[in-house]
């Protein structure tokens, strides 16, 4: 088996990713050229892919359709997907909730899910949503943040209000660093340095002239 890397830049080879062949250039043109070079169509049963797709969808929606309190992450993802149109944009900050959105939020158009997955930059969700709202003022834009990530750049609410940007910020609040808790537990460590106090986010938003709910 050979791994073919198709991208606009060279691969970053490491111990887990080492492609044998690299195609560097325009991705669409590269894929078209590869398809033409293959000649006859490959004998692939697309029904197998459809079964995998259907199983993934079933798993996504199964728990989302079982209302609970507090809400399950799957239910939150499903509710937001239902509220947003196919061209609307969500911008994810970095936290443990991001995993649920990355796995379960169905995307129908390119660049409608914005997330900094590799660098895991906390505080990126709100600025990303602001830029999306500037570029696409007629689309719905939602920034989805944990409380920790939101507070790292929360002062930009003032900028968003001043520029009259059309966006919503959803804060998933647990008064702690959830991703770090998960990683500490996975490494066998006890919780340490994870919990903190937050402001009243409704009043905090209103202090900048935004609407808090």
Regions found by a protein language model. Name each.
Residues 8, 94, 174:
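Residues immediately flanking
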Residues 13-16, 22-24, 28-34, 100-213:
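Thiamine diphosphate
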Residues 1-50:
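Glycine-rich, acidic loop regions that bind phosphate or pyrophosphate groups
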Residues 23-27, 31, 42-49, 53, ...:
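Generic structural signal for well-ordered, non-membrane alpha-helical segments
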Residues 54-138:
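Active-site diphosphate/adenylate-binding microenvironment
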Residues 5, 91, 144-145:
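Generic enzyme active-site microenvironment
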């Amino acid at each position: 088996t050979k791994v073919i890397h198709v991208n606009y830049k060279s691969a970053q080879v490491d111990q887990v990713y080492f492609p044998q062949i690299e195609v560097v250039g325009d991705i669409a043109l590269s894929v078209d050229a590869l398809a033409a070079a293959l000649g006859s169509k490959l004998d692939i049963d697309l029904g197998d892919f459809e079964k995998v797709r259907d199983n993934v969808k079933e798993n996504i929606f199964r728990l989302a359709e079982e209302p609970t309190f507090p809400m399950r992450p799957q239910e939150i993802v499903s509710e937001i997907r239902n509220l947003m149109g196919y061209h609307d944009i969500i911008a994810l900050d970095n936290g443990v909730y991001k995993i649920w959105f990355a796995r379960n939020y169905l995307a129908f158009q390119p660049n409608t899910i914005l997330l900094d997955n590799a660098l895991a930059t906390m505080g990126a969700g709100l600025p990303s949503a602001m830029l999306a709202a500037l570029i696409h003022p007629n689309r719905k834009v939602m920034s989805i943040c944990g409380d920790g990530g939101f507070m790292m750049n929360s002062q930009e609410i003032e900028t968003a209000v001043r520029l009259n940007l059309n966006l919503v910020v959803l804060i998933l609040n647990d008064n702690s660093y959830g991703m770090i808790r998960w990683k500490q537990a996975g490494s066998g460590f006890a919780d340490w340095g994870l919990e903190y106090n937050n402001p009243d986010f409704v009043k905090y938003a209103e202090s900048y002239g935004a609407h808090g709910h």
